[in-house]
Each structure stands twice: as structure tokens, then as C-alpha cells.
Amino acid sequence: MAMTVHCDIVSAEGEIFSGLVEMVVAHGNLGDLGIAPGHAPLITNLKPGPITLTKQGGAHEVFYISGGFLEVQPNMVKVLADTVQRAADLDEAQAQEALKAAENALNLKGADFDYGAAAARLAEAAAQLRTVQQMRKGK
């Protein structure tokens, strides 16, 4: 039996996942992170994108987060995010439409243009698409 660590994924709306996992893979601000049982304690920012859990027994579950924080303690991994969705609940067509709308907004710069907000919408839509693609690849 593989070693496991307890993982909680929590959004502003409440707990989304709680259980034993063999591995957590997430996108930190400085690169990808793979957290396995026995990992050194750390706290880091997370970029928008997929979080992949390898659950006890080897099954994978993918979530989309809009960014947040990851905390690793000796017997626990905790992900705190504003928005969390199961990748299976994401609509690929809607994410592609949001990506196109964000790209168009960047091209139609006007006097009231908020580049930061447009870039954030573009990054979020691209991260949702990556999450859907990663979930499909894992099946």
C-alpha cells in the first residue's frame, strides 16, 4: 500500500475535497510542485490552473483553481483558493469563448482600458482550458 497524506481543498464557498492522497501536483508562482508524503513543510502562492490529486489507490482527480495558497505540513496538505471547480464540471466551449473574448478585449484598447483586468481574464480562461485538457489526458 502506497504512503498517503491528508489533503484538503477549500474555496471561499467551503470544503471541496478532503481525503487521503498519494500525490498533489499544482502550479506555483515559481514552477510546478509535486507534493508527496514526507515533503518538507512549505507555504507558496498558486497560479490559476489545474491541481491534480493522485488519490489512495491511484485514481486521479483534477480541479481548477483561480489561484490561491498551498500549505504543506508533515501530515497534511491544504489548498486555499477563491474559486475551485472540479475539472469535469468545466465547460470547454465556454472556456474557449472566454479566451477569445479576453483576447479581443486586449486588442480593442480604448481610453478606459484596464490592461491588468484584461490580462487576468485571459490568464484565467487559458488556465481553465489547460485544466480541461489535462483532465482529458489523464483519462
Swiss-Prot record:
Disulfide bonds: none annotated. One of its GO terms (cellular component) is proton-transporting ATP synthase complex. It is found in: Cell inner membrane. The keyword Magnesium does not apply. InterPro entries: ATP_F1_dsu/esu_C_sf, ATP_synth_F1_dsu/esu, ATP_synth_F1_dsu/esu_N, ATP_synth_F1_esu_C, ATPsynth_dsu/esu_N. SUPFAM superfamilies: Epsilon subunit of F1F0-ATP synthase C-terminal domain (SSF46604), Epsilon subunit of F1F0-ATP synthase N-terminal domain (SSF51344). Pfam families: ATP-synt_DE, ATP-synt_DE_N. It is a peripheral membrane protein. Keywords: ATP synthesis, Cell inner membrane, Cell membrane, CF(1), Hydrogen ion transport, Ion transport, Membrane, Transport. GO terms for molecular function: ATP binding; proton-transporting ATP synthase activity, rotational mechanism. F-type ATPases have 2 components, CF(1) - the catalytic core - and CF(0) - the membrane proton channel. CF(1) has five subunits: alpha(3), beta(3), gamma(1), delta(1), epsilon(1). CF(0) has three main subunits: a, b and c. Belongs to the ATPase epsilon chain family. NCBIfam families: ATP_synt_epsi, PRK00571.1-4. Produces ATP from ADP in the presence of a proton gradient across the membrane. This is ATP synthase epsilon chain.
